Amino acid sequence: KINAGNIDLIYANPFDAATLIREKGYRAIARPVGKSDEMVIAAAEKSAINTLEDLSKGATVAMADNRDVKLIGLRLLEAVDLEESDLNWEVTENYQAAARKVIKDEAQAAMFLAEVFHGLSRLTKMQLTVLIESDLATISHVLLVKDGFDKEDELTQAVLDFHKDDEGKATLTELGMAEGFEAMSEEDAEFMIDLMETLQ
């Protein structure tokens, strides 16, 4: 939790961003281009679970410790009348470990950050069946600045121009944000926060 009010710039996940904007005096200035926080629910390819409907109460779901993924996943599971308390949750060290649990039949399903899922090895993905992938394009990590930060305009411009030189491009690619950042309006941030609140 971020309680210190002396941090001027924060790159936050959508849930933390909501709290920081509503309660801690931060404003969104930018978000990565084409990089929304989608998630995937998958089961073992060899199991009898081929659709979300096949998941039943008492099933074990493996996942890395990621609140964003879990909340979006729970919203998707509402469609098949499953709530958090209906399932057993196995928190793994990382997403690869969650995939292994499902493949070894130690869990009936796993939740993944979509980007991580699509980056798994071909061999791993061949052993998994995607039950559903979220499509909430408006939800993403955001760059926040503290109200009253005196260099906000310069900083915003620097962030938006970061991809324009080779060094910046290389850094962004390393961070998985090859296309850089785009400006984010207060309206866009409010819309995202409202959406996050409906997920909680």
Give each language-model segment a name.
Residues 1-47, 65, 129-131:
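Short, glycine-/small- and polar/acidic-enriched structural segments
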Residues 3, 22, 60, 78, ...:
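Sec-exported extracytoplasmic/periplasmic mature domains
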